[in-house]
Amino acid sequence: MAARRRRRRKNKNGTLFFCIVVEIIAVLALIGILRWPYSQADRISQKRKPVVQELHISRINISHEVQKQAQSHIIIGEIGGEEIIYPASMTKIMTAIVAIEELSDLEQEITLTSDMFAGLYERDATQAGFQPDETVRAIDLLYGVMLPSGAECCIALADSIAGSEEGFVELMNQKAEKLGMDGTHFCDTTGLHDPDHYSTAKDIAILLKYAIRNDTFREIIESPYHSTPGTNIHPDGITFYSSMFNHLPDPTVTGGKILGGKTGFTNDAGLCLASYAEIDGTEYILVTAGAFSAGTPHIDDAVTIYNRLGEAALALHDE
């Protein structure tokens, strides 16, 4: 584990790369260090000629990236995709999908207790705005998990479903194992830093691909905002805003649009983003992690990469 963490720290600087597109199958590579898995190369016939030779992308901020077609298992490019990362709040994708699958009634009411907030203020955890003794619907907690990244919503769902956060984390790790997320281990539902709470960009891509097959999850993650009904504490309800769409007022990219995503940040993880977009009728998943620059480099990088994919897709139609 220590060796994997040391390997992870080597890649905090921005990375210059280009992409080659062959019939919408793009291969992203580090300049001078080709990362083209043999299994991927075998899928691409030597007789096919690339219609776009090189699409140079300016220096980006990520140190780990995986991009794949959402409808298939084909990875079209990666930078450090199997290296250990701290997933931060991308963890909440797993929290949400496990909760959705475990809940028998999304309209059931759950009361948040003061114990559920223990340690959240001290660790400066992001919260959705619910209060102790507030009774809310499970569906509103799910929106609170995915849009504003509310830690109290994660704990409330975990307690209600499994009796404790620890019990719920067992379900998360079981799901990770079932999905083949071999480089992942969860310690909590929130993504707050723990050295033993880790994943890989490739594993998060596997997770997001699985989660967006669920209609409820998809509706939640694609929502720019959500307003709850009134509660005993907030009679006018609460309106949540997506932490991704907040920084992405126009999700349009060349040839399509970014449909949804989950951001993450801790001091150790850097800025992270797991997102997906539809470009020229094909859905793509992009997971980036390890951006330590100021501003919103995780979102800027996603827009840049999706735009390049769109340009490549449009170039195919001009042939």
Model-derived features with residue positions:
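Active-site-adjacent loops and short helices of periplasmic peptidoglycan-processing enzymes
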Residues: W36-K202, A211-I212
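Intrinsic disorder/low-complexity segments enriched in polar/small residues
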Residues: N11-N13, I24, L55, A70
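Penicillin-recognizing serine hydrolase domain
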Residues: L16, W36-S63, I75, S164-E319
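N-terminal cationic amphipathic segment used for targeting or macromolecule association
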Residues: M1, I24-V27, S39, Q174
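Hydrophobic membrane-insertion alpha-helices, especially the h-region
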Residues: F18-I33
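Structural signal for hydrophobic packing residues in well-ordered secondary-structure cores
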Residues: L28, S149, I161, L309-A313
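N-terminal Lys/Arg-rich, disordered targeting/topogenic segments
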Residues: M1-L16
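Hydrophobic alpha-helical segments, especially transmembrane helices
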Residues: I24, I93, A277-I279
